[in-house]
Amino acid sequence: MRIIKQVMLATLMLLSTHSMADSLKVMAYNIMQLSVQDWDQANRAQRLPAALMSLSDSPDVILVSEVFNSDGEQALAALSTLYPYQTPNVGQDCSGSGWDALTGNCSNSPFVIRGGVVVLSKYPIISQKAHVFNNSLSGSWDYMANKGFAYVEIEKNTQRYHLIGTHLQATHDGNTEQEHEVRMGQLSEIQSFIETENIPVNEPVIIGGDMNVEWSKQHEVADMLATAHAELNFKTPAVGSFSAKDNWFTKANAYYFEYSLDYNDTLDYVFWHRDHKQPINAPSMTVRYPKAQNNWYWSYLRGNWNLSDGRYYHDGYYNELSDHYPVQVNLEF
């Protein structure tokens, strides 16, 4: 009987510890709202708020990327009842308006578009700063965008959290080694920023976004985590965050840009900085699969598709919100 009581007491103490723990749920989501070409931007953007607001296990913070147009910004504004604290769009205004600080290589050229990163929070943002990357690959599409990162310090239940949302250099041709080097340079800029901020070591630092690092290339993942001074728990899912095999909108992207219609990998991450306060729950990153409640028509999808398992006729109706699925980590401290 004494042993049973001791076990029960230990269990109650463990449950009490978890109930008292500070927690933060963080999502990274590339919503693919481009400023050029017809990718059904308006229809997807209109349906995004309802899909995010209906999610179970709702994130406290969303690190959003590829908000390159007004449709995307209007969708985020429609989420203000759930996420009343929102940063400006990184690189949209090189004056630094709306930020506590803006650093880096922000271009005022009329040919350069906004960076597309926005942070949404349920909890007050105490400080918000933006940086436009100095590292960028000349000749790539990314070179014509003020891509960088948004830093926020938020407060939830008296605990301060520091978050960085970003979108690293995309792969635009076969020279992945060169693009990987640029991505690591961009992560080094993030690390330099963290060091300069002198963030207390007893406060968490969380980094997330579309890193454009393929989970299947574990040597590149190792480089990413080492450069970012980061920790990550993630098991390969059946459907990754960027899956042409599962997501018909991603399949359309694969067809247009001529890569495998069966492509299935993860490019998006949320990890925590190893030099700051560590989570106590060994959190795992998961891929989430939000979809619109109802299907709608997009003419690009309609027709016969030659798939690996045979010819398939698509009627043009779909309910995907982006070519990426979001990833989420629930952290306890």
What kind of feature is each model-predicted range?
Residues 1-8:
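Bacterial N-terminal signal peptides that target proteins for export
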Residues 17-81, 88-114, 180, 184-191, ...:
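N-terminal, active-site-proximal structural segment of metallo-dependent hydrolase catalytic domains
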Residues 23-37, 129-134, 160-170, 324:
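Active-site-proximal beta-strand elements of phosphoester/diester hydrolases
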Residues 24, 59-61, 161, 204-206, ...:
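Short, Asp-centered acidic motifs that coordinate Mg2+ and/or phosphate
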Residues 34, 69-72, 171-172, 212-218:
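Active-site environment of divalent metal-dependent phosphoester hydrolases
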Residues 61, 67-169:
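Structured beta-strand-rich core segments of catalytic domains in phosphoester-bond hydrolases
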Residues 148-166, 179-220:
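His/acidic metal-ligating clusters that form di-metal
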Residues 195-206, 212-333:
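Metal-dependent phosphoester-hydrolase catalytic domains
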